[in-house]
Structure formats: structure tokens, C-alpha cells
């Protein structure tokens, strides 16, 4: 389980499928109202309090994103009781959760710096990955891999490499493509490799 603060009232939690498996939870059960899911959310909130000082002391909205071969990203947002959420059900200190489930068919990763992307590229090329589309948006960098890009690639190894340098993105590719800047449309990995590494040999 990895936690990251996105804003004063918002955190991102990344759970691998191993994290879920250890608790006997499938991705389809994650949004269901069952005791083991309650236990998971309680543990998440305790860890968020310990690590980030994020206290779930009122209504929260929970967005769950399923990422293929990667795990689940959970966005937890605290609401303002007066406006964002209905106050019904809060009398007993119950945490109200509004859950949204979304599933993506692509691999889409976010990086803090272009240097992270450049450092990653030779390792991806060694793995056989030549494709991908590179974007920038709000000072961060994003790589998208389609099913065609992933054909013949060991996805577990790919995800392990990507996770060393970046994070699964919870922003959709559509948003980044529409509001961000397209840097390399196709074959981003091999083009970056040829630009930054082949010239040195």
C-alpha cells in the first residue's frame, strides 16, 4: 500500500493486487459493502492519518480505479459537510462513502520529471518495449501504452519497471490528451532511446 497526498482534502492510495490478495479481496469486491472491505478502508485511513496527517473525520468520497496488471488506485476526498455531501447518517460518527468505480484497458503512468522518463527508456527498450505515447500536463509527464504496444511484452516486468520511476495515473488519457501537450505520438520509447542514447554510442 502506497499513499500520496494530492491536496489538503485529498489523498491517493495505490494497492497492488498482492495487497488485495493478502486480505482475501478481489477487485470486484472492493466497492461492495462487506466487512473485509470496511477493514481495508479503516486500515487505509489509519495509515493515512499516521503517514500524512489525513483524518477522515467526516463524509468522504471514494473513487476506485482498476489498472490492468497493476492494482487499484483509490482517491479519497474529504467533503465539506455543509455543501459537498448530505449530512444524513453522520450523527453516529459514521463515515459516509460515495464510491465510483472505473476500469482502464491501457497502461498509463505519470512521472514527476522528464529525467525520470529518459532514465526509464533504456530499460524499457531492453524489455522489448518500443511503443508508447508521451504527454506533458500541468508540469508532469505521462506515458500511455495501448494493447498494441503491449503485444508480446511481459506486462508484470513492464509494470515493475514503470513503478520504479513513476506512478499509475488516475487522470484519464482523454483529459491529458485534450488539455495537455502531445510530445511524441507513437513509438515514444524507441524515439527517446534513439535521441538520448544511440547518439552517445
From Swiss-Prot:
Taxonomic superkingdom: Bacteria
Any one biological process term the GO annotation gives: establishment of competence for transformation
List keywords of the entry alphabetically. Competence, Sporulation
Q: Which InterPro entries match?
A: MecA_C_sf, Neg-reg_MecA
Task: Name any one Pfam family assigned in the record.
Answer: MecA
In terms of Gene3D superfamilies, this protein maps to: 3.30.70.1950
Q: Name one GO molecular function term.
A: protein-macromolecule adaptor activity
Q: How does it assemble?
A: Homodimer.
Per the entry, what this protein does is:
Enables the recognition and targeting of unfolded and aggregated proteins to the ClpC protease or to other proteins involved in proteolysis. Acts negatively in the development of competence by binding ComK and recruiting it to the ClpCP protease. When overexpressed, inhibits sporulation. Also involved in Spx degradation by ClpC.
Domain comment as written in the entry? The N-terminal domain has binding sites for ComK and probably for unfolded/aggregated proteins; the C-terminal domain interacts with ClpC.
**HAMAP family to which the protein is assigned, alphabetical:** MecA
UniProt similarity note: Belongs to the MecA family.
Q: What is this protein called?
A: Adapter protein MecA 1
Task: Specify the species.
Answer: Halalkalibacterium halodurans (strain ATCC BAA-125 / DSM 18197 / FERM 7344 / JCM 9153 / C-125) (Bacillus halodurans)
The gene from which this protein is expressed is mecA1
